[in-house]
Design a protein with these regions (language model features):
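Membrane-embedded and juxtamembrane structural elements of multi-pass membrane proteins
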Residues: 30-58, 71-134, 140-368
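Charged interaction patches that mediate protein-protein contacts
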Residues: 1-6, 364-369, 454
């Protein structure tokens, strides 16, 4: 059994494993929210699907820092750049595709299912090193960017990311303080009784403060830390049924840690700010968060309650800034939410669909890469006419030793190649012939198909290069 086959099996196992974890996590969350507890569920107050979305930015920064510390500046920066490209490409492609499929998905599956689909990058990249340890095939698509252009684009992207995400964090902190300054505790015994009743119905023990605020026109919840969560209500009178609907909606957001999901979506927007469709997709994802809470609040409601809830959405449309969850934050989606609120209807849970999407995401990640440093193969291998020590050609399972190393070095020097920003473990055979050699500087190389794998003694990870022209294997065989 070859090493490449073992890596394929490990990758398949990892895909099925993550798919199963997502499916089970979603089912556990669904059952917890609906009071269907089992012995392995701790409580109902946490309805997060498997992983808290805040894990996504935290783990990316953590793994980039760890690799920089372990592998040093060169290998660490290359790993971080590869991880960044993989995440940017996956989030851009996945979010764009999901956005176009969303109308069909919303018709067939629950709003909760659609909301969870946006979280697939969280589960995929929570241990990115596992994806690279099991990767053995070259990318299907390679985009060439000259080194200077790549550095300029990275600088522009990094500046945009820091400005956008930094501004969002600053806006969240400022908005949170403003809300606190212009708020007061709710002392109305009837409202507090309804609040405690809804908390008891949801079996929620997370501390959430309840306050009036003169700045907001819509009920909202804010707070990134467990003990800093606050639900703010506009200063007006509330009926008992109206208050119960509002509290149920906001506390379901707290159960799901949707303020963290909002942070994750804003991080993705900043990450893919160059791609306008990522912005649009992130807004659609935020809509699904609200739709999924509407769905569970009205799950057992009659037609009269549904109409009252629709009127509530219409009367409380407002603005939600920072990492907040709002009852009715956007007039842009109000029409769809009101239609979904009034109509109701039975939809599929989609556990198998989530499993399939997760598994395919693992298998499909890393199919697109970026190449740079287009130059001669001799320069990449650090090759000169007398620097080859041993070279072997493998053809049809037969190993042939190349004796005319000077002529081979001359031919290899005439070939053009480009270096890929790509992290993997082992290069699989690309079919046809293989050429393996050692240079006098102890660097090794292996040419297979249109790719060359180079292992430098001073680097811990191999370097993958792509040939810019077909290799003349008959000519190489003539050098034996």
């Amino acid at each position: 059994m070859s090493e490449v086959f073992i890596l394929y099996m490990y990758r398949m196992f990892w895909a099925l494993f993550l798919g199963a974890l997502l499916a089970m996590g979603f089912r556990r969350s669904w059952n917890a929210e609906h009071g269907k507890m089992t012995s392995w569920m701790e409580d109902r107050e946490h309805a997060v699907v498997w992983l808290d979305p805040i894990v996504f930015p935290v783990m990316i920064i953590f793994f980039a820092a760890i690799n920089l510390w372990v592998y040093g500046s060169d290998d660490g920066v290359e790993y971080g750049l590869c991880l960044l490209i993989d995440i940017f490409v996956f989030v851009s492609v996945y979010f764009t595709g999901l956005m176009f499929l969303l109308p069909m998905l919303r018709r067939r599956y629950t709003a909760r299912t659609c909301a969870v689909l946006w979280l697939v990058p969280v589960f995929l990249f929570y241990q990115p090193h596992m994806l690279y340890l099991m990767r053995s095939e070259p990318p299907l698509v390679v985009l060439y960017l000259p080194g200077i252009l790549l550095r300029v684009l990275l600088a522009v992207w990094a500046a945009g990311f820091l400005v956008l995400f930094g501004t969002k964090i600053g806006s969240h902190i400022w908005f949170s303080r403003r809300l606190r300054q212009h708020s007061r505790p709710i002392l109305d015994p009837e409202l507090l009784e309804i609040w405690e009743k809804v908390r008891c119905d949801l079996d929620m023990h997370i501390p959430v403060d309840l306050r009036y605020c003169s700045l907001t026109r819509t009920p909202l919840t804010i707070g990134m830390r467990k003990k800093s969560k606050v639900t703010y209500l506009p200063e007006r009178a509330y009926g008992a049924e109206e208050a119960e609907l509002i509290f149920s909606h906001e506390l379901h957001h707290v159960q799901r840690r949707d303020t963290h999901t909002k942070c994750f979506l804003e991080f993705c927007k900043a990450l893919g700010w160059i791609h306008p469709l990522v912005w649009l997709a992130a807004r659609r994802a935020q809509d699904d968060l609200e739709l999924s809470c509407d769905e569970i609040v009205l799950e057992k409601a009659d037609a009269v309650t549904r109409r009252k809830y629709a009127e509530l959405l219409l009367s409380t449309a407002g603005d939600g800034r920072g990492f907040t969850t709002c009852l009715s934050a956007s007039a842009r989606t109000l029409r769809y939410r009101m239609r979904a609120t009034v109509s109701g209807g039975k939809k599929k849970l989609g556990v198998v669909m989530l499993f399939t999407v997760m598994a395919l995401s693992v298998l499909g990640m890393g199919k697109i890469s970026v190449s740079t440093d287009r130059t001669s193969l001799a320069e990449l291998i650090q090759l000169s006419e007398d620097s080859l020590s041993e070279v072997y050609l493998t053809k049809d399972g037969e190993e042939i030793r190349i004796s005319d190393l000077e002529r081979l070095a001359g031919y290899l020097s005439s070939l053009q190649a480009e270096r890929l920003i790509y992290t993997y473990t082992l290069l699989s055979e690309q079919g046809g012939c293989d050429l393996e050699g050692i240079t006098s500087s102890d660097a090794t190389f292996r040419m297979s198909g249109s790719y060359v794998e180079i292992c430098y003694p001073e680097k811990r990870n191999p370097v993958l290069c792509r040939m810019k022209e077909p290799v003349d294997w008959q000519k190489i065989q003539a050098f034996e």
